Amino acid sequence: MDGFRIIIAEKADAGRRIAYFLSGGQVKSHRAKGTSYLEFEYNGSKTYLIPLSGHIVEADFESGYSDWNKIDLSDLIDARIVKNIKNKVAYQTLQAFRGKVEEIVIATDYDREGELIGVEALDIIKEGKEEIRRAKFSALTKNEILDSFKNLIGVNYSLADAADARESIDLIWGSVLTRFFSVTTGRLGKSFLSAGRVQTPTLAIVVDREREIQSFRPERYWTISITFDKDGQFKARYPENIKDQDTAEKIYEAIKGKNGRVSSYTSKEDHIRRPAPFSTTEFLREASRIGIMPTKAMSIAENLYMRGLISYPRTDNTVYPRSINLKSVLKKLENTAYSKYVKEIETFDRILPSRGRIETTDHPPIYPVDSPKEQLKGDYGRVYDLILRHFLSTLYRDGKKTVAEAEIYVNGYTFKAAGQHTTDRGWTEIYGYDPKDVYLPELTEGEDLKAIDWNIQREETKPPPRYDMSSLLKKMEELNLGTKSTRHDIIGKLIERGFIEGNPVKPTPLGMAFIDAVRSVNSHIADPEMTAKLEEDMDRIEKNEMSKNDVVEESKKMLHEVLSHFLTKTADVKDIITKGINAGQEIGDCPFHEGKKIMVIRDRFTYTVRCEDPSCKINFRIKRNGSITLSDQKCPVCGLPMIKIIRKGQSPEIKCIDPDCSYNRENEDYGECPADHGRLVLRQSKYGKRFLGCSNYPKCTVTYPLPQMGRITKTGEVCPYCGAPILALSRNGRKWKFCPNMQCEYNKKRKPEAAVEKSVRKKGRNASKS
């Protein structure tokens, strides 16, 4: 095997596309030591491509530091970090080629993480005599791949060092802070209390805004407006908010019933500027505006990249490099839903795309590189559509509008009116953005205007809005919290760990208490400046301005100082967080204890619904895979209030707040178990999937997966083939019966049930993994 080439790819899908393009489709697949690799000829040389699945090794502390209760946290900060094998199969495959290779080409993603993965592979496979090169590409297309292998570059070890430093720093900070808060509050095991150097200041942003809202005191003010009529109605407003009621009424009485005279009028043509090309942050912000959460949007974008449909989705760049052949890209987009605009852009004498403020050389902005051969479904189609229409908008023409302003004199007071009229929608026609026109007719100075309505309105100042996903991502970028590749994950972790919820984003009582505890000891880890300084240092590693070891050591000194503050006030931290954990969200009055409230307490995996009075029988847990509100219905059995549990894709579940009420048992009971005559009860798995399980579990392990979408009701019938209860499914205006035993002959003999079976197999296969 002497004299051959090895190519290291980051993922299997990317590896297959690279091998296909380099070989012209002539690829052999091999499997050895539990992993697959590809063989082909390239440039007259035998070539093997080894696809990895992310990191081969991972950073951890050396052995002896695993006991959370016994290890001194100061010692943990300075513990030696080792690299343990994470992917044994990939490690053994690379080892098998060690010393037998003439050339190694790293073809992982060209960013910090990708470079570190490539360097990890090099450390395993190289002996020192091999030629080591790097393929840099930004899209998994034929032209990009072939061009990158014709123009191989050197490995960027500084890029890998920056990623390695981040991995070490995040390990140290995350482990020390998480252990401190978890041990201090007694939240161990699955309920551990997570903390980190980036997620803590990000949580603080959300908490600070909530505190602003809570402490906000509205102030009254008055506004005055006049409606005029000239070829249509328009409004002019008094230019100030008037804080004094007497002054407002004085002005109103002076202008009421009076006409106006134009004292000035200006009109000008203006542009509706095209958006800048997509950076990662702006893409995620726009995706959140169409209802796709950042973590999901990034996952979909990575999938589209692997399929060769879009460029690399992790980038700060907002300027298309000259190397992109825009006309060639447009040619591939001619058969999309926007073909009309594609063909129009192709007729431009020169295509001059918009430009953003940030220009980098690692990757271009996100743009479509090909059109899908088959229609993309669901959110995949929506994300691709967003990227496509955004790209076309950056190439199209600016919109145009006429902007007008007028000052109108009314009995000693000046009122102002403004209007705009879109004369050319331009790019907004593609993007689906509809500029709002405000009517203001053409006026001349000295012209008399007829007033038809005079209005005085009392208003109140409003609190600042909560952050939504879009504005939170923007704020993180402004404060240099995280990177383009990590911000969506940080938000996702805060949601998963019960610190924040909803969109707009609201902190949970636990999130509020956590930040209060952090700030009670003056530790500064909630301040963005500390983590932003470390982000800047990691940028300096990439630029060869600092060494990896210097940055890691500096971060350790910071953490020692932070820890010393916490250790002096352990009891205070415990008290604040414990109160936050027990606070919960109030959803209504308790019917059994006057003056007490029913609370919903959110844990990492469950909701606890309980009364403030610890002796009350209202105390039960529900798996945390939906939202809980107090229903306006009363229980038909006992008359007590009911709660509504809303899970995505399922009809709301209504429960009586009395856990012993027969209403709950009757509505969860779907019939007799055919195996042991127990009751088949509706359950929710830890993954949020609904299924039927026998009430005699664990003695009886019978379970039936259920369709995850639609409303399921009892029919009272029993299956003549297997004895299970026959159920009815209502969905999309249709209703049909089915047996929950999806292999049953009943379903095979009834045509509509084929659709049910397919739905269950696809969406309910994990339902019984409780």
Swiss-Prot record:
The keyword DNA-binding applies. Keywords: DNA-binding, Isomerase, Magnesium, Metal-binding, Repeat, Topoisomerase, Zinc, Zinc-finger. Residues 4-140 form the Toprim domain. GO terms for molecular function: DNA binding; DNA topoisomerase type I (single strand cut, ATP-independent) activity; zinc ion binding. CDD domains: TOP1Ac (cd00186), TOPRIM_TopoIA_TopoIII (cd03362). GO terms for biological process: DNA recombination; DNA repair; DNA topological change. It catalyses: ATP-independent breakage of single-stranded DNA, followed by passage and rejoining. Mg(2+) binds at E10, D109. The keyword Protein biosynthesis does not apply. Residues 194-199 are annotated as: Interaction with DNA. The active site is at Y312 (o-(5'-phospho-dna)-tyrosine intermediate). A zinc finger (C4-type) spans 611-638, 673-700, 719-744. It is an enzyme of class 5 (isomerase). Its cofactor is Mg(2+). Residues 156-563 form the Topo IA-type catalytic domain. It holds the Pfam family Zn_ribbon_Top1. Monomer. Belongs to the type IA topoisomerase family. This is DNA topoisomerase 1. The lineage of its organism: Archaea, Methanobacteriati, Thermoplasmatota, Thermoplasmata, Thermoplasmatales.
